[in-house]
């Protein structure tokens, strides 16, 4: 259910864009992200930092898009969010306080070296996605960017999540692997 809620704003953004335009879709994205926070809090009595950061970025860049009637702001939002995720993961790893380990370490006990590999993998992934977003957003038609944002980045994230799970599974202690079978 939680994962479905995470996709709600994206689905609404895409649908509204297809029927209207980027400006109405940006307003819908702000509203849908606020609704996502409200529903998530109502169901789980907790909000994750990632959701709050995303909401703040959506609100700021969505509002700038509407006020200045310039879609460049909503396009930059994607790159800035990915850059923030890459920086947060990279800095936490440099400080030996892996965010990924703190999120998943209780369920999956693997060596710190493995957490470091995964963290740097995601740093590179987020940085690359941010750079590719800049290219697609400002070199290709708006419709191509919307499709890339909704389908391309979502698919890439899902594929990288699967790769991460398999990599973690490969390095789990034998007793933990048996529990997962």
Curated annotation (Swiss-Prot):
Keywords: Cell inner membrane, Cell membrane, Membrane, Transmembrane, Transmembrane helix
Pfam families, sorted: IspA (PF04279)
The organism's place on the tree of life at top rank: Bacteria
InterPro entries cross-referenced by the UniProt entry: YciB
GO cellular component: plasma membrane
Segments crossing the lipid bilayer: 10-30, 50-70, 72-92, 118-138, 148-168
Location relative to the cell: Cell inner membrane
Membrane topology of the entry: Multi-pass membrane protein
Family (UniProt): Belongs to the YciB family.
Function according to Swiss-Prot or TrEMBL: Plays a role in cell envelope biogenesis, maintenance of cell envelope integrity and membrane homeostasis.
Name of the featured protein: Inner membrane-spanning protein YciB
Organism: Shewanella sp. (strain W3-18-1)
């Amino acid at each position: 259910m939680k994962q479905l809620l995470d996709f709600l704003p994206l689905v609404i953004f895409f649908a509204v864009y297809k029927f209207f335009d980027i400006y109405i879709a940006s307003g819908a994205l702000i509203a849908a992200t606020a609704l996502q926070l409200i529903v998530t809090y109502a169901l789980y009595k907790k909000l994750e930092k990632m959701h709050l950061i995303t909401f703040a970025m959506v609100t700021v860049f969505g509002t700038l898009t509407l006020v200045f009637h310039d879609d460049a702001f909503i396009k930059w939002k994607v790159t800035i969010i990915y850059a923030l995720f890459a920086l947060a993961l990279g800095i936490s790893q440099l400080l030996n306080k892996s965010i990924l380990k703190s999120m998943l370490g209780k369920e999956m006990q693997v060596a710190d070296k493995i957490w470091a590999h995964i963290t740097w993998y995601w740093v590179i992934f987020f940085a690359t996605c941010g750079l590719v977003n800049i290219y697609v957003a400002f070199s290709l038609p708006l419709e191509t960017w919307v499709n890339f944002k909704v389908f391309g980045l979502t698919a890439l994230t899902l594929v990288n999540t699967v790769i991460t799970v398999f990599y973690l599974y490969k390095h789990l202690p034998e007793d933990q692997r048996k529990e997962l079978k």
